A protein has these predicted regions:
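N-terminal helix-turn-helix DNA-binding core of bacterial DNA-binding proteins
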Residues: 13-56, 75-77, 82-84
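Short, charged recognition helix plus adjacent turn
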Residues: 111-123
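Basic, amphipathic "hinge/linker" alpha-helix immediately C-terminal to the N-terminal HTH DNA-binding motif
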Residues: 77-98
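Short, solvent-exposed amphipathic helices
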Residues: 93-111
Length: 123
């Protein structure tokens, strides 16, 4: 396979697609939930990630599985079918970065909220 030189600012660079995927609304929450709980079933993930629809959670998990960030294990011998999700080593390598973003958001929540209010009042 030809090695690609990443350039996040180039429209055709696959690294841009990866960054966009990581920034999607439910991706960070699903990865965070799997990091905290280690192994989860679909319904457990849906309960933890409040507000996610079944369709969006399914799409998010499929993307993460496709990209190798999540491992999906199906237990076909179980009735009803049992499916579990966990982070792959690649997914685990993303956790520290997402934890930093989470910490930054929590640390700056009040200031950003105040800025939003001031902005809206200035209109």
């Amino acid at each position: 396979m030809k090695e690609l030189k990443p350039d996040i600012y180039a429209a055709a660079c696959p690294s841009r697609e990866i960054l966009i995927m990581i920034g999607e609304k439910w991706v960070c929450l699903v990865i965070g939930a799997l990091d905290a709980q280690k192994i989860l079933r679909f319904g457990e993930l849906k309960r933890i990630c409040e507000g996610v629809s079944q369709k969006m959670l399914t799409q998010t998990l499929r993307k993460l599985e496709r990209d190798g960030l999540v491992i999906r294990t199906v237990y076909a011998d179980k009735v009803p079918l049992k499916v579990e999700y966990k982070l792959s080593p690649l997914g685990k390598s993303l956790v520290p970065v997402l934890q930093q973003v989470k910490s930054w958001a929590e640390m700056n929540l009040s200031e950003i909220n105040d800025n939003r209010i001031a902005f809206e009042q200035s209109k």
